[in-house]
Amino acid sequence: MRLSEILAVALVTGATAYDLPDNLKQIYEKHKGKCSKVYQKGFTNGGHSDGKSFEYCGDIEGAIFMHSSAKGGQYTNMDVDCDGANNSAGKCSNDPSGQGVTAFKDEVKKFGIPDLDANLHPYIVFGNEEHSPQFKPQKYGMEPLSVMAVVCNGKLHYGIWGDTNGGTSTGEASLSMAELCFPEEKPDGDHGHDDNDVLYIGFTGKDAVPGKSANWKAKKTEDFEDSIKSIGDKLVAGLKA
């Protein structure tokens, strides 16, 4: 699906989100296909139709993103992750693989919460551990709990790098991020977004870390996202197509 088609869908759904700046529109169209700086390849999107064609790419200066060269070039999907605090609450109650802890539980406890809550915090699962191939974003300069940009449904949202995958699949985010991106699809713990049209961008460097400035104790997802928006806007503005 081309960005113009996705934008049309977003207008129909009326989802509250941020408009894509021009540089991000150009990035979205430009980086689907080939990657000249492959950090690690051989991953799936959690399914079988596109094989192990997904890879972490460093072609955008100061950033890391996921893409696949299959089918002429594409990004990845958005499976729902419910790991962390309240992992069986609300729409996460039917998650077949939920765990009661995220990868950065110890770090986020410093901000007065027991762990990230997938029902509340819009986090992205980024990086792969335990199985081969592996990819550790920290090796390339990403910091735990740093701001990430997500292009979904023709719009821009901000989340944080909040978890890693124990296998070799990619394209996963918390329930609250899926609800921000695709409210019309009514995601839950066992149902996400299948199309490979979601661009996840991680940023390198400590400037991407919100720390105490993020509203970790927010009661609404939108309030948390709003608390990291200024950092996200600055990071996105610095990206070159």
From Swiss-Prot:
One of its GO terms (molecular function) is chitosanase activity. GO terms for biological process: polysaccharide catabolic process. Pfam families: Glyco_hydro_75. GO terms for cellular component: extracellular region. Keywords: Carbohydrate metabolism, Glycoprotein, Glycosidase, Hydrolase, Polysaccharide degradation, Secreted, Signal. Glycans are attached at residue 86. Residues 1-17 form the signal peptide. InterPro entries: Chitosanase_fungal. The keyword Secreted applies. It catalyses: Endohydrolysis of beta-(1->4)-linkages between D-glucosamine residues in a partly acetylated chitosan. The keyword DNA-binding does not apply. It is found in: Secreted. Its EC number is 3.2.1.132. Belongs to the glycosyl hydrolase 75 family. Chitosanase catalyzing the endo-type cleavage of chitosan, the deacylated form of chitin. Chitosanase may be crucial in the degradation of the deacetylated portion of chitin in the fungal cell wall. Chitoolisaccharides produced by the hydrolysis of partially N-acetylated chitosan are known to have many biological activities, including antibacterial activity, immune-enhancing effects, and elicitor activity. This is Endo-chitosanase B. It comes from Aspergillus oryzae (strain ATCC 42149 / RIB 40) (Yellow koji mold).
